[in-house]
């Protein structure tokens, strides 16, 4: 799990006291419990602007979000591996009524399910390496209404990170300006 020198090998840094990680996102407190080593490690890597996935040492399949055992073979043996952070919108939810007050000024906003280019259709045609995250602008702010209207299933995106504190960051998705985009990405008929 990581390398001893990066301070992330056990999810909390070798030789350090186990402590909850705290941050802030859109003015809301973020807490990653000290018992959640997998997510602590994931968000710490994000804090270093690195997107990493767990790779099973037995079946060699990557997985996101982090889990304590491989969903494909049930092995607990894994290592954190970097992934490129580019992919395609597999599905999305367009939110028009914010439950959290901090999101109200950003309506409508998108919650994307992105299928990463690594491990597409593996181990079967209906599976892949997927990660959720908000659609954002390149500066890490939530996407504008205009950007939301341009994104649908098939849009090419890449990861960016919004710092939430000294050690952790939130992975977000921005339109990949370097990638070929669909002329008209498929969108749910809501307007």
Give the location of each predicted region:
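A broadly conserved sequence feature marking short terminus-proximal activation segments
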Residues: 6-54, 151-152, 160, 165
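Short metal-coordination and nucleic-acid-contact micro-motifs, chiefly zinc-binding Cys/His arrays
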Residues: 49-52, 66, 83-85, 150
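Short, cysteine/histidine-rich loop/knuckle motifs that typically chelate Zn2+
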Residues: 55-58, 72-75
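Short functional micro-motifs and their immediate structural scaffolds
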Residues: 64, 78-79
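Residue-level marker of beta-strand positions
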Residues: 86-88, 156
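Glycine-rich active-site loops that engage anionic ligands at enzyme catalytic sites
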Residues: 90-148
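Well-ordered alpha/beta subsegment
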Residues: 128-190
């Amino acid at each position: 799990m990581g390398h001893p020198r990066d301070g992330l090998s056990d999810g909390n840094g070798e030789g350090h006291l186990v402590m909850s990680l705290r941050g802030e996102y859109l003015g809301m407190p973020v807490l990653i419990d000290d018992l959640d080593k997998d997510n602590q490690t994931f968000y710490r890597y994000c804090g270093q602007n690195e997107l990493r996935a767990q790779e099973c040492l037995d079946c060699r399949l990557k997985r996101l979000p982090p889990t304590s055992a491989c969903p494909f073979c049930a092995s607990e043996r894994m290592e954190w591996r970097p992934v490129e952070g580019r992919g395609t919108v597999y599905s999305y939810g367009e939110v028009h009524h914010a439950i959290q007050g901090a999101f109200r000024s950003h309506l409508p906003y998108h919650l994307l399910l992105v299928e990463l280019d690594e491990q597409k259709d593996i181990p079967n045609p209906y599976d892949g390496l997927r990660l959720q995250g908000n659609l954002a602008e390149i500066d890490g702010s939530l996407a504008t209404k205009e950007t939301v209207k341009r994104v649908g299933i098939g849009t090419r995106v890449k990861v960016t990170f919004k710092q939430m504190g000294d050690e952790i960051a939130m992975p977000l998705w921005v339109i990949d300006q370097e990638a070929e985009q669909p002329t008209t990405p498929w969108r749910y008929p809501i307007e």
